[in-house]
Structures are given as structure tokens and as C-alpha cells.
Amino acid sequence: MKVLQEKILNEGKVLSGDVLKVDAFLNHQIDPVLMQEIGKEFAKRFKEENITKIVTIESSGIAPAVMAALELGVKVIFARKRKSLTLQDNMYVANVYSFTKQETNEISLSRNHIDESDRVLIIDDFLANGQAALGLMSLVEQAGASIAGIGIVIEKAFQDGGKKLREQGVRVESLAEIASLDNGTVTFVQHETAEVK
């Protein structure tokens, strides 16, 4: 997605060979116009999948998930990382290790909002080692719902998360795929485009 790649190049900051900071538009301050375009792109890519619900994880996945849900006309349910006094019982639970925060979180979804009749699109802001996506897949599978695919805003293709998910037969659609963050520079994966004759 060209507009997203341009935003990453203009406003993202490479902090190391593994870490890209995009808090200027995605995971701290949010650019609503960009989020709207991201939502439209996810809806376009998954429109034939009969999505009934979008599942994401708090908090950075919420903005792109809501915009995609708006385009698809479905609801969003987000996995919580913290226990809530209002959500104590009747929860699906999974453990997720955060590479960025270097900690394991217990994530949960209420059983009241997802069931075996749902066809789910999972959306998240980043895909690196795949732990968040695998945790969300576990929650969806515990509910007996089917997974239509995973939409990722930014994939670090040099890490193994995307490979792990695709090897499980899951459709993964990433809007920006980063090949490298070496030497403080963002390099995107170049996809071959077929020539139309």
C-alpha cells in the first residue's frame, strides 16, 4: 500500500535492526485519514470472505480494525491484555509474549461476543514473531469460530511470524512488508508484478 509505505518512510523512525517506531501515525498518535484508507484496503482484500466479526488486540490494533469493520459492516471485538472487574467469568484466554515489551501477557475475549457461527478476520498493527496473531488465533479457535484470514498493517518480513502463520495455511495480507531495517533504513519487500499484455 503505497500511501502507508510513504508514511513509514516520512514519519517512521528506525530504532534498531528490529524496531520501527511509528507512533506518529499508528500506535500512539493516530492518523484517521490513513486509518480510513487502511480500513478500505483490508475490506477490499477480504470482501469475498463473508466476515462476520473482526478480532484484534488492545490497543494498537483497534484503530485499523474499527475502520475495516466500518467498511465491512461488522463488529470488532478486541482481546484485553489486562483483567477487568467487568469481565471476570466466561472468557477465552491465551498467553502472548510481546517482543517489544519483553513480557508475557494473558489476553482474553468474552465468550458472549464470539461463537462458532462467526467467520473472523484478525487484524493487528504489526507482525514480527507472530505471537500476538497466534494468541488471537487460539482465542478464535477456542470459540469454535473460523478464521478467514489475518490483516496486518506492517509486517517485519525479516522475522519469522509471517512464515509461521502461512505455514499453518492461514491467509495473511500485509499492507506494508519490511525486508530490512538495517543501517537505520527501511527497505520494503519488492513484489513482482505481472505485465499485462
Swiss-Prot record:
Q: Which reaction does it catalyse?
A: XMP + diphosphate = xanthine + 5-phospho-alpha-D-ribose 1-diphosphate
GO molecular function (one): xanthine phosphoribosyltransferase activity
Gene3D superfamilies according to UniProt:
3.40.50.2020
Family annotation (Pfam families): Pribosyltran
Transmembrane helix as a keyword? no
HAMAP family referenced in this protein's UniProt entry, alphabetically: XPRTase
**Role description:** Converts the preformed base xanthine, a product of nucleic acid breakdown, to xanthosine 5'-monophosphate (XMP), so it can be reused for RNA or DNA synthesis.
- Describe the subunit structure: Homodimer.
Q: Could you tell me what this protein is called?
A: Xanthine phosphoribosyltransferase
Query: From which organism does this entry originate?
Result: Bacillus cereus (strain ATCC 10987 / NRS 248)
Name of the gene: xpt
